[in-house]
Regions:
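Extended recognition/assembly regions associated with phosphoester-bond processing machinery
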Residues: 2-582
């Protein structure tokens, strides 16, 4: 009798629905047989019991598995590794419960505050023109879309002064204090917060007040609440130990999160007993009057159609662009208004690129020509955004547009159908703002966070972007490209340019944010912003999905103008497109 069958026989006849459901979920998700996962569990009865006691849900396990795969740079996971990850989750929860049992005193009822979203009315001029003094119209008889990009987010004009950052310690101080870098960014954020919140400057309060960014005093390890510290960049990066009670619902703290803190300074000024945490931005949701919105749709009754996809576009050990070319052809037939094509196009993780077997410069010229030829007779505007592993745009974030650094794009500059953008980027589309973050900020936030167990970490990661008004609110970033023998690494973010990742220049948060995460595909409404992740075009040797986003015209009957109530997101399997008639 196999080990799996012996274990099955030992388990009660009425095996719990929770265990069965979990095994079915993991088996289907990771393509491992249910029996094999069960065979890796030494004591299935105890495992079943612990699942109930610790209230472990499949999403929590899935998040940890994805983080493990990402950190280990693995595409697959074994049954033994799955069991080990679940065991670690149980151990951490047991540790937290013991810690809670020992905590007493004034720190018990800590207040973790995320202010409820406020909804206000705002005119179209207040939302767009006041900030950028530009016309943002696109319809069949309106202003051409490329005019919208003239004076947008300065990410378009950051120039070529980028450099890679050497391996770093917990707090890369030298990088943080450079011109226009994190120190200046932090100072502006703090001043703005205190200016707009006079009540927090009252020095007569019976507690101490701080504005700090959070960090974890460990590197390349899963942090715990014991590792939490607060850093003050404006006081020579002074570090405070933060004593925080974990008995709080909905808590989610990220390394790099700028936070207002109330508490008591103890231990000769080294430790803060935290009583209150608050994000430095509130999330404001806005409605634009119907009369301001309808002007964009008077000349066209068609819903606005957007397609977007993320590289890489061929497998790690291949150089075959035939599927990519076929998708271009099929999207061109659909004739959408906008097609967003994100890199990487020639990823440094591809073996043939890594060893110089491909001429990536000529390859990029061929790609641009192919895109131009396919869409030359359509109404479609093409946006091309680099990826952080692009061989022809190998800069840390924020990345400049391809045409800012590569002369070989001069020949296509006159083509009104193709527009090169930065990574990240915000641009206006009629009355909406769309943000593009072509990097795995969702996973990076989750990996660099501590949180209570009963939360949706993906939702909280999206929410953190909005509360920090920053496309990459993570510092230091531990998920960075690894090089030969995993000995050397460089930072994902150029910290001297960190202020360019902030989007507090716009009055509202973006209406739609497009991401590129290894997490499963999703479309989520988070406080009025629709987050869309379609994953990568090519995953290992398999093909993923692209996204179609439809923005419907405002209804004459309901006069509904909120973008998140008018948008529809569909994920289309690439194999389905490739197998259709060419």
């Amino acid at each position: 009798m196999s080990q799996a069958k012996r274990i099955k026989k030992d388990v009660d006849q009425e095996e719990s629905q929770a265990l069965n459901s979990l095994l079915d979920h993991l088996s289907k998700k990771y393509n491992i047989s249910k029996d094999l996962i069960l065979s890796s569990i030494p004591d299935a009865k105890k495992f079943d019991y612990d699942l109930k006691i610790y209230k472990i849900n499949p999403q929590e396990i899935e998040d940890e598995i994805e983080a493990f795969k990402f950190n280990q740079t693995k595409d697959l996971i074994t049954a033994d590794e799955i069991f080990s990850i679940i065991k670690d989750i149980m151990a951490n929860k047991n540790k937290e419960e013991k810690k809670l049992g020992n905590q007493t005193g004034k720190n018990k009822n800590i207040s973790y505050q995320n202010a409820p979203a406020k909804k206000n009315n705002i005119t179209i001029n207040e939302k767009i023109n006041v900030k950028y003094n530009t016309t943002v119209v696109y319809n069949e008889g309106g202003v051409e879309m490329e005019k919208q990009f003239n004076i947008m987010n300065p990410l378009l004009d950051v120039g070529n002064n980028f450099h890679l950052i050497e391996p770093y310690d917990l707090i890369p101080k030298d990088a943080l204090i450079q011109k226009n870098g994190y120190q200046r960014y932090f100072s502006e954020i703090k001043d703005k917060f205190l200016r707009e919140n006079e009540q927090y400057k009252d020095e007569k309060k019976p507690f101490d007040v701080f504005v700090l960014f959070l960090a974890f005093d460990v590197i390349d390890q899963k942090p715990t609440y014991d590792d939490l510290v607060g850093i003050d960049p404006l006081a020579d990066f002074k570090k405070y130990i933060l004593k925080i009670n974990t008995n709080t619902d909905n808590i989610f703290l990220v390394s790099g999160q700028i936070t207002y803190i109330e508490g008591n300074l103890v231990d000769n000024g080294k430790t803060i007993e935290v009583s209150k945490l608050k994000n430095i931005y509130e999330i404001n949701e806005y409605s634009i009057p119907y009369k301001d919105v309808v002007q964009f749709y008077e000349k066209s009754s068609d819903p606005f159609a957007i397609y977007y996809m993320n590289g890489p576009y061929f497998s790690k050990d291949s150089k075959d662009f035939s599927v990519f070319n076929n998708v271009l052809k099929n999207v061109a037939i659909k004739n959408p208004h906008l097609f967003i094509i994100n890199g990487p196009f020639f990823s440094t993780e591809n073996e043939k690129v890594k060893w110089g077997e491909l001429d990536t410069e000529e390859g990029m010229i061929d790609i641009i020509k192919k895109i131009k030829d396919e869409f030359i007779k359509t109404r479609t505007k093409i946006l091309i955004c680099p990826g952080i592993s692009d061989n022809e745009n190998f800069y840390p974030l924020p990345q400049p547009p391809f045409d800012k650094i590569n002369n070989f794009f001069i020949g296509s500059k006159g083509n009104s159908e193709i527009i090169f953008i930065s990574n990240p980027q915000i641009f206006p589309l009629n009355e909406a703002y769309i943000g593009i973050a072509n990097f795995d900020v969702i996973k990076d936030i989750i990996v660099n966070s501590i949180h209570s167990s009963e939360i949706n970490t993906v939702d909280k990661a999206c929410e953190m972007i909005l509360y920090q008004k920053n496309f990459y609110p993570v510092l230091p970033n531990t998920t960075v490209p690894k090089y030969e023998n995993n000995q050397e690494r460089v930072a994902t973010v150029d910290l001297s340019q960190y202020n360019y990742l902030n989007f507090d220049r716009i009055e509202t948060n973006p209406d739609i944010i497009l991401t590129n995460s290894a997490m499963k595909t999703f479309a989520k409404k988070i406080h009025g912003t629709v987050f869309v992740n379609c994953g990568s075009f090519c995953k290992g040797n398999n093909y993923g999905e692209i996204a179609k986003i439809t923005l419907h015209n405002p209804s004459k009957e309901t006069k509904e103008t909120d973008i998140n109530k008018r948008v529809k997101v569909e994920f289309i399997k690439i194999n389905q497109i490739n197998n259709s008639k060419k």
